[in-house]
């Protein structure tokens, strides 16, 4: 059935409000460039912020433009069950709070691929970098596509500006949006993202709740709203395994398992938010507040428009056509229930959602490019040594150029997703496809000490190859475990593919790791053969050939071999990957797990500090500062103040402006130096003033970090 696309709604006042908002956010984000003294500031906001700013920032990232569009669409079609995706993240949160979060902070990694190099090997970093960049670029593409679909209903076919007639197209609209978003993240960095998100997060919550509350009033109040909804719309869960486009079991595997772990553990954009908190404790508070309070509210914010639209369609069927495009439902219902200007504000909220999510992801891609591509390549080309100090000026330039480049790649990725009928299905396919191998790699790497480089690389290469076979043969490989979900020949098992992908990736990871002793034995025997390099090179050629065969078979369906033959080849190829990795990769299980798994976090804290921990409880102190000569990164306190703080020279200190509403914007980290005798005074160097941008005469608060 052809769906009706809404066009040319809204007024000139709405456009004025939208444009003013976009310009304001551009200027606001660019303003924060002054807080970027180095790449630590650009990517991680200087590790300075308190929990409430990060919690609100996470809201703006989680409630992206595709959330408004896709959950309102599902709310319109299926009711309150559209909130399932926002209520199923809780059971993985403890693993994040007490496992992954302290690991990534205390290990001082600057990207997820860097963690894999330290935990496994440089080759592991290479493969994870490829998957991570694909994940982030794809996510950016979905964001841009959604933004275009959301704003397109407002657009006429032509727009006249100063006498010139401009033809409006979806891709043209997306390119303009990309320029705006790319500009402020390119120059503002992570601090720009966090503070624009503080504004946008509040705006998103207010706009979404306003649409829901005003919509309920529009249909006659809560009693009328409740009675207008069909009984099935009031259920908290969708059908167990039907319809194919939205069901509980599919949502569980695609979103609750793959999506939740992917969002918490591997979404570098989100992780960089937590790395911008002043310490791990603040990050834990931000995550806890988000899961207990922000996500339930967010479920109403993004789904409420669809619920109201359903009630309006029952009350007055003429206002909302039966065959309306579900992706337009939030924009349409907002236009119906709000007046000129207010509707523009609501659309600006969607713009805020896109800008928040995409800017976060672009910042993350730039971080990965600088840390995991640019620097390793320069080391490989012998232009620099691995331990050389970073050229911050060059790194900042590379970060900004790469941000602009990934903005363009994100727009190009739109073409890959535009063929899907709805954003919800496109996003589900994206989650089910790119999340499982990285999810298994991260989860096993952090929580299973015995997980080896062979297990990881076999998961990434062999697991992905088996996933490709699942896409090519869904009836044979996915349907037996699809829990009875209907088969859609155009988009087969969009959700249940996540379960299949998780099974094959987990199976490869576990089996290869458990066979590590046997793999080492075989590798040692091969090393004794005179022409062992020829054997290994032949295996590498075989691995590449089989992987190419799997790709050709899925995309071109050339039927090189029947399913049984392809599965056999792929399994044998996976064994070869494990053997080649075991043969070439040097791995010290003790050294490369200490401080990098959940079982040795205390050691990671010592590494973070650089000395033994001082965990004595102390008090925070209020101080003023005095500038002294020197360029050493230490701050000197009085003996009395250090006694209050239970601090010793060499301990870590965090000092901030006492104005809580700044959320740590004017703050910095340093080290306790030798004490002096001026109580209530700290001795700063100019570098501390530059980092913290403290205001002369303002009272500061200092706390011992560890």
Where are the model-predicted features located?
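Short, structured interface segments
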Residues: 514-522, 695-704
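Short glycine-rich, polar/acidic loop-and-turn segments at beta strand-coil junctions
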Residues: 58-62, 72-74, 641, 657-659, ...
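Short beta-strand-centered segments at strand-helix junctions
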Residues: 611-656, 667-703
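Short, charged beta-turn/beta-strand-edge "cap" motif at the junction between a beta-strand
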Residues: 658-662, 705-706
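Membrane-embedded helix-loop-helix hairpins and adjacent transmembrane boundary segments
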Residues: 1-611
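Generic "edge-of-domain/loop-turn" microfeature
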Residues: 37, 281-282, 642, 660-662, ...
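Short active-site-adjacent helix-start/loop capping segments
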Residues: 65-67, 663, 691
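Short secondary-structure transition/capping segments
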Residues: 222-223, 702-706
């Amino acid at each position: 059935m052809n769906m009706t696309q809404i066009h040319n709604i809204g007024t000139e006042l709405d456009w004025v409000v939208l444009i003013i908002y976009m310009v304001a956010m551009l200027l606001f984000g660019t303003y924060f460039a002054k807080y970027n003294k180095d790449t630590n500031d650009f990517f991680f906001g200087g590790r300075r912020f308190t929990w409430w700013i990060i919690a609100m920032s996470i809201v703006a990232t989680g409630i992206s433009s595709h959330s408004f569009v896709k959950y309102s669409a599902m709310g319109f079609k299926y009711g309150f069950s559209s909130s399932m995706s926002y209520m199923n993240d809780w059971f993985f949160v403890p693993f994040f709070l007490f496992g992954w979060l302290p690991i990534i902070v205390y290990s001082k990694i600057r990207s997820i691929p860097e963690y894999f190099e330290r935990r496994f090997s440089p080759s592991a970093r290479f493969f994870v970098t490829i998957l991570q960049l694909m994940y982030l670029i794809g996510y950016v593409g979905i964001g841009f596509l959604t933004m275009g679909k959301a704003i397109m209903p407002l657009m006429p076919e032509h727009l006249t500006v100063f006498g010139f007639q401009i033809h409006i197209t979806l891709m043209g609209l997306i390119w303009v949006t990309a320029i705006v978003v790319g500009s402020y993240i390119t120059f503002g960095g992570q601090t720009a993202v966090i503070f624009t998100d503080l504004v946008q997060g509040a705006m998103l919550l207010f706009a979404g709740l306003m649409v829901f509350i005003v919509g309920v009033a529009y249909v006659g109040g809560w009693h009328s709203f409740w009675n207008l909804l069909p009984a099935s719309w009031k259920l908290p869960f969708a059908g167990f395994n039907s319809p194919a486009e939205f069901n509980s079991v599919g949502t569980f595997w695609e979103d609750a398992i793959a999506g939740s772990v992917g969002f918490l553990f591997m979404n570098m954009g989100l992780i960089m938010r937590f790395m911008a908190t002043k310490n791990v404790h603040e990050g834990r508070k931000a995550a806890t507040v988000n899961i207990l309070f922000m996500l339930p509210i967010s479920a109403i914010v993004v789904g409420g428009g669809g619920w109201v639209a359903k009630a309006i369609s029952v009350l007055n069927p003429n206002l909302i056509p039966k065959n309306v495009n579900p992706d337009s439902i939030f924009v349409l219902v907002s236009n119906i229930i709000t007046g000129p200007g207010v509707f523009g504000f609501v659309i600006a909220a969607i713009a805020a959602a896109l800008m928040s999510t995409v800017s976060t992801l672009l910042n993350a891609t730039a971080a990965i490019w600088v840390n995991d591509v640019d620097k390793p390549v320069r080391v490989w080309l012998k232009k620099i040594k691995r331990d050389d100090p970073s050229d911050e000026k060059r790194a900042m330039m590379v970060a900004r150029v790469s941000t602009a480049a990934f903005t363009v790649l994100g727009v190009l990725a739109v073409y890959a997703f535009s063929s899907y009928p709805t954003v919800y299905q496109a996003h589900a396919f994206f989650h089910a496809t790119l999340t499982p191998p990285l999810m298994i790699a991260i989860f096993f790497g952090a929580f299973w000490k015995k997980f080896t480089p062979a297990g990881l690389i076999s998961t990434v290469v062999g697991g992905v190859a088996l996933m490709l076979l699942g896409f090519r043969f869904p009836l044979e490989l996915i349907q037996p475990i699809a829990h009875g979900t209907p088969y859609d020949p155009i988009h087969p098992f969009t959700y249940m593919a996540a379960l299949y992908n998780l099974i094959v990736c987990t199976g490869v990871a576990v089996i290869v790791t458990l066979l590590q002793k046997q793999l080492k034995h075989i590798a040692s025997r091969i090393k004794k053969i005179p022409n062992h390099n020829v054997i290994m090179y032949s295996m590498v050629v075989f691995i590449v050939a089989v992987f190419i065969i799997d790709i050709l078979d899925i995309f071109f369906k050339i039927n090189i071999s029947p399913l049984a033959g392809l599965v056999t080849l792929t399994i044998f190829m996976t064994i070869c990957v494990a053997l080649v990795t075991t043969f070439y990769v040097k791995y010290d299980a003790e050294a490369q797990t200490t401080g990098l798994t959940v079982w040795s976090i205390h050691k990671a804290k010592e590494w973070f500090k650089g000395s033994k921990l001082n965990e004595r409880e102390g008090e925070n102190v209020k101080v003023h500062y005095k500038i002294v000569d020197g360029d050493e990164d230490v701050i000197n306190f009085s003996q009395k103040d250090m006694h209050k703080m239970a601090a010793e020279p060499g301990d870590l200190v965090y000092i901030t402006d006492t104005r809580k509403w700044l959320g740590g914007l004017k703050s910095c980290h340093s080290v306790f130096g030798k004490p002096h005798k001026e109580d209530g005074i700290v001795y700063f160097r100019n570098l501390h003033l530059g980092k913290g941008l403290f205001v002369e005469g303002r009272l500061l608060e200092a706390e011992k970090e560890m």
